[in-house]
């Protein structure tokens, strides 16, 4: 994809500061001072973050109201890596569910051919909110203690000897502020005249939250991206046809 777009056209570490939409096109300005001018602009941020963008003119009031009311969840992960799949030696497949937490679901995500063994743990909801406020060493401790308790092993067990421990708190990320996808207020998504996800002027909106398939997942993001690209292409073709007709 990078080769298709052209690596010179991919600008990393260039957060968008403002978007100015006019009848003739869009100007996007980054926090690094770069300006990009185009006929159309596709915004793929979660709608929760629209309020962090300086969009001129502002989005319609109804669209702002919906975007400002969307919320992202506490959806966190802890990946505990080991040099052996010790849970299999105990007769378990690594999948578990817990109503006590902090881990509510975990599964074996090992890659056996590479001798990489891991349990991926999901720490979500209210438990995830509390877990995310802990210090890193505390998050590690409570996850290992829970795994040890579930599998009925002691302090000398391999569960307490991971070779790596990774965690991801999406609420801590500036450009996501949560996961999986923004949730709208009841009824916002189903109203026939809802502006949610609809284009405004030369601005088009894509993201997994707008997908009709696999909403909240990468597949949903791809589906929405394809639809957004088609929407822009159709709009440009219609504009070109209109210009030819006038001429």
Sequence positions of predicted segments:
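Helical element adjacent to the flavin cofactor pocket in flavoenzyme catalytic cores
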Residues: 1-32, 36-40
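Conserved flavin/dinucleotide-binding core of flavoenzymes
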Residues: 25-27, 37, 44, 52, ...
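Residue-level recognition of strand-loop junctions within catalytic nucleotide-signaling folds
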Residues: 31, 83, 124-126
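Central beta-strand plus flanking loop segment that forms part of the substrate or channel wall
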Residues: 62-90
